[in-house]
């Protein structure tokens, strides 16, 4: 099923179909906002847990919690990307609604002028009718360009590096990832070298004395 069939299928008018789809998108955006609030609360709790584990010298727990926080932030980022796409689609639908209204008005004016031209047979009215028809074609071409540009924009999706997410939270508690915790994106399940363990333990011991 193409986009046009999805938008304007059924017994409803195009305007009614567009309004219904916009309401559905609005509900989806609100649900994403609620989920983001829950993730924000969980993030704050995880940061406190990481700080507590670091001060207690619990290296293993700090690693696990840092990876959990990394996954949480990745999930939130994907959620925000999804919301951005929903907003872009909603804007596209609104643009289509506006364009549809304008084209309907122009078609109505064109039909009116055509009828007047037939009854009055005035060359000036014929020129005005031709101008309206040209403007109508331009509007349709612009709508096609808007659709193509919006499709290109929806395909863009940036991805953050996982180690940057872990580094950020560990910087907050005074632990340097390059000297302490292993990179969560590449070293999960591996055994760190003894020197790395010693460096991390020393930093955790120092943090616990603060």
Swiss-Prot record:
Which residue positions does the secretion signal occupy?
A: none
UniProt KW keywords: Coiled coil, Cytoplasm, Endosome, Membrane, Phosphoprotein, Protein transport, Transport
- List each coiled-coil range: 15-97
Residue span of region Disordered = 1-38
Which coarse location class applies to the principal site listed for this UniProt protein?
cytoplasm
Offer one example of a GO biological process linked to this entry. endosome transport via multivesicular body sorting pathway
Note the Pfam families from the entry. Answer: Snf7
* Gene disruption: observed consequences: Leads to multivesicular bodies sorting defects.
Q: How does it sit in the membrane?
A: Peripheral membrane protein
Q: Cellular location of this protein?
A: Cytoplasm; Endosome membrane
Q: Which branch of life, at top level? A: Eukaryota
InterPro entries, from UniProt?
A: Snf7_fam
Q: Bias category Basic and acidic residues: which stretches?
A: 26-38
Q: Name one GO cellular component term.
A: multivesicular body
Task: Tell me the subunit arrangement.
Answer: Core component of the ESCRT-III complex (endosomal sorting required for transport complex III). ESCRT-III appears to be sequentially assembled as a flat lattice on the endosome membrane.
Chain's role: Required for the sorting and concentration of proteins resulting in the entry of these proteins into the invaginating vesicles of the multivesicular body (MVB). Acts a component of the ESCRT-III complex, which appears to be critical for late steps in MVB sorting, such as membrane invagination and final cargo sorting and recruitment of late-acting components of the sorting machinery. The MVB pathway requires the sequential function of ESCRT-O, -I,-II and -III complex assemblies.
Q: What is the protein name stated in its UniProt record?
A: ESCRT-III complex subunit did4
Q: Which organism is it from?
A: Schizosaccharomyces pombe (strain 972 / ATCC 24843) (Fission yeast)
